UniProtKB/Swiss-Prot annotation:
Pfam families: Glyco_transf_8. UDP binds at residues 9-14, 103-104, 228-233. Residues 1-267 are annotated as: GT8 domain. InterPro entries: Glyco_trans_8, Glycosyltrans_8_dom-fam, Nucleotide-diphossugar_trans. In the N-terminal section; belongs to the glycosyltransferase 8 family. Encoded in RD10, a pathogenicity island with an atypical GC content that is associated with invasive pneumococcal disease. Pathogenicity islands account for greater than half the genomic diversity observed between isolates. The main function of this island seems to be correct synthesis and export of pneumococcal serine-rich repeat protein PsrP. It comes from the Bacteria. Signal peptide: none annotated. It comes from Streptococcus pneumoniae serotype 4 (strain ATCC BAA-334 / TIGR4). May be involved in the polymorphic O-glycosylation of the serine-rich repeat protein PsrP. Has equal hydrolytic activity against both UDP-galactose and UDP-glucose; no glycosyltransferase activity has been seen with tested substrates. Keywords: Glycosyltransferase, Manganese, Metal-binding, Nucleotide-binding, Transferase. This is Glycosyltransferase GlyB. One of its GO terms (molecular function) is metal ion binding. The keyword Nucleotide-binding applies.
Amino acid sequence: MNTKSIVFNADNDYVDKLETAIKSICCYNNCLKFYVFNDDIASEWFLMMNKRLKTIQSEIVNVKIVDHVLKKFHLPLKNLSYATFFRYFIPNFVKESRALYLDSDIIVTGSLDYLFDIELDGYALAAVEDSFGDVPSTNFNSGMLLVNVDTWRDEDACSKLLELTNQYHETAYGDQGILNMLFHDRWKRLDRNFNFMVGMDSVAHIEGNHKWYEISELKNGDLPSVIHYTGVKPWEIISNNRFREVWWFYNLLEWSDILLRKDIISRSFEELVYSPKAHTAIFTASCEMEHVEYLIENLPEVHFSILAHTYFASSVVALLRYSNVTIYPCFSPFDYRKILDNLDFYLDINHYKEVDNIVSVVQQLSKPIFTFENTSHDIGNQTNIFSSTEPNKMVEAIRQFIGE
């Protein structure tokens, strides 16, 4: 079987994210040769990784990029590292004719055979366009590059990229801008399935780009082959972009389960860590939710999703100390649909105004609603109403409903 060469840039601060990406690849692929371009990752980490990877006929190469001028180059975002420019050096260190470059904030959900089998048709690389709507883009996203290493090597691409960066780093959009300068008309378009960027999920509706949610919706619940966590990252305390739980699934997988290809690798985050008996939700425009903490504490088998069109007060964010709580500030249409699709019952316990006519929406779904007499937004009184002085009775009713 031919070796699949896969390249990452990384620094020591990102090594846990890098390892999560590698874990996801190893779940579905053998005969891998990872190149990790870095200047500060300890050799002990590579020793342990090579011991693990040997089980699946794979290896990892510690490529140290030293004595470089990259630190002086301007970066478009504060959270980016100069290590992003390390991909320029692919033709100098990768021995194989083809390599797949991946950013470390990526998860792979299946076999990579297709990418290593397709014809590059003489192009210098294959990539996915960097588009955030229905208007085609002439630029590619540099987070996933299928590199024609022979072409890069023959053309001395590394030197050319460094020269262009030296000239234009103040105005170009980082390495991506420079790569597009050099290869602007010499790249093959790939389906977005191979670099599915989710960074717009949580901001498109705020910017009025509602078309995004139609264009980027996946059919039949399928996962993209390559998920790219652009924008807010899934390891941050709050991130409403899609597939957060997918990243955490691979992050928490044990290496022994991956290398032995145990059944768990084909399951989900909930099956791996936490599978609630029921899901509930609260749509609110206020931080005041009647007895919310009491309900959370006394219904540990229920997962609570709290959604708002705005950012949350610190008192709501503090509820994240409970493992059965997720909050959705500035929730998106994707969040809305996901919550309603999973909903078992609704809690109408927020004070002040109702959000998005949610009580009627839930009633149309034929889902039960539990409320207090001082928070009910149901003018028809069709919900299960409890006294705010006896929250224990609501807890008892919910337990009975979910079969506890």
